[in-house]
Amino acid sequence: MRWISRPGWPGHLLALAAGALTPLALAPFVYWPLAILSIALLYLGLRGLPGKSALWRGWWYGFGAFGAGTSWIYVSIHDYGAASVPLASFLMLGFTAGVAFFFALPAWLWARCLRRDNAPLGDALAFAALWLALELFRSWFLTGFPWLYAGYSQLQGPLAGLVPVGGVWLSSFVIALSAALLVNLPRLFPHGASLLLGLVLLLGPWAAGLYLKGHAWTHSAGEPLRVVAIQGNIAQELKWDPNQVRAQLDLYRDLSLPQQDVDLIVWPETAVPILQDMASGYLGAMGQVADEKNAALITGVPVRERLADGKSRYFNGITVVGEGAGTYLKQKLVPFGEYVPLQDLLRGLIAFFDLPMSDFARGPADQPLLKAKGYEIAPYICYEVVYPEFAAALAAQSQVLLTVSNDTWFGTSIGPLQHLQMAQMRALESGRWMIRATNNGVTGLIDPYGRIVRQIPQFQQGILRGEVIPMQGLTPYLQYRVWPLAGLAGVLLLWALLGRQLRPQERRLFG
């Protein structure tokens, strides 16, 4: 098995395969032990490698992970961006090759500055710290791409009890630590004290996760809210067709009018497919309907802001009418779907760079939450719900979470189900109920433990009825966010860096 840790193609191909295991640990498959196996194979494959070889070993791992785990991007480019098969394949491969460097550069840093082969316990801790740093970096760099985090595999796994304590970050840290410790355990057998400490580090977090699973960190803030969520199932090719606007508005109106004994009616992202000011009459009429039902109607709608120079800015928004108030403007935009980077160069080259409604501006920070039926509602539009820290900041001020989306762009791929899993994790992290309304699925109600209690299947029109309970109180994660864990990771990385620099004087510290 030494070939795994040697430079060359056999090790690189194993890293590619190990990376491709990543999506199998996540939704919709959820074979969560594969997350540990995947990372363990990468850790073993980096042992003893020089910097350049480690960089390419990490790159191949990343190519496997993103190539398999974000293959739904091809669907968006080909099916809805009108790109030919060769062009869509080229763009998909180019994207995958680029984001694979998220793993390549940390692998190089590990080999050059942090790895200590003669300190198995300290090495495992430093590797887990670097893994956490990588996931944090991915959530921020170039607006972020926080997809395929290892911690999502534990949504309903043994570590679920740790998620309200440290978020998906703590789950990822423990998985990476467990993977490295399992690789290093054979080296600890001759050393009784080190072996005992290694077993405590390996088994302790899993025992804590099981012990805390189901613990109630938050409690009810009032009576249950009766919710109706509408899933219109509008085909993407009809979504922005001007000739289909009236039909879509009539559909959502007609599905909502018969609903009785309801507190919240929720429509998906851009369910109103025209600008808010152009739909003012329609929204006003629906607000009157909601008032008559003593309910609030919350819908996605694009928003126009007229500027002093006569120009306009456009936003992806959510607005409330009836028994509530507020309009929220999306802050985390999807590249190419909602804005085009370098648009002066790319606009018009191919249809994918000129999609409908792909010229949105970013909403301002520190917007007030939505208000409905006397409660604060934390809004997330589509992609925003995948950002743990961003979501936590809003959740801490709220009693109910709301996410609206249009995942039609991703067809029958695994993308929408990965997206749903991340939304479930936000509910678990915050200890709050979440309402999720989508155009074509999965629309659902998620409880504070991340479990789906009501849902409408994908690709069908439907009306979901259920109840959510407004919650108050803060989980440890909402109180402290990632900072305690990030501080620990920083100490571990500094320790590894100093230990590496002082290697001649090091005396098997931690190992």
Curated annotation (Swiss-Prot):
UniProt cross-references to InterPro entries, sorted A to Z: Apolipo_AcylTrfase, C-N_Hydrolase, C-N_Hydrolase_sf, LNT_N
Record-linked CDD domains: ALP_N-acyl_transferase (cd07571)
Transmembrane segments: 24-44, 58-78, 90-110, 125-145, 163-183, 192-212, 482-502
Membrane topology: Multi-pass membrane protein
Matching Gene3D superfamilies: Carbon-nitrogen hydrolase (3.60.110.10)
GO cellular component labels: plasma membrane
Top-level lineage group: Bacteria
Family membership noted in the UniProt record: Belongs to the CN hydrolase family. Apolipoprotein N-acyltransferase subfamily.
Primary role: Catalyzes the phospholipid dependent N-acylation of the N-terminal cysteine of apolipoprotein, the last step in lipoprotein maturation.
Name of this chain's protein: Apolipoprotein N-acyltransferase
Taxonomic classification: Bacteria, Pseudomonadati, Pseudomonadota, Gammaproteobacteria, Pseudomonadales
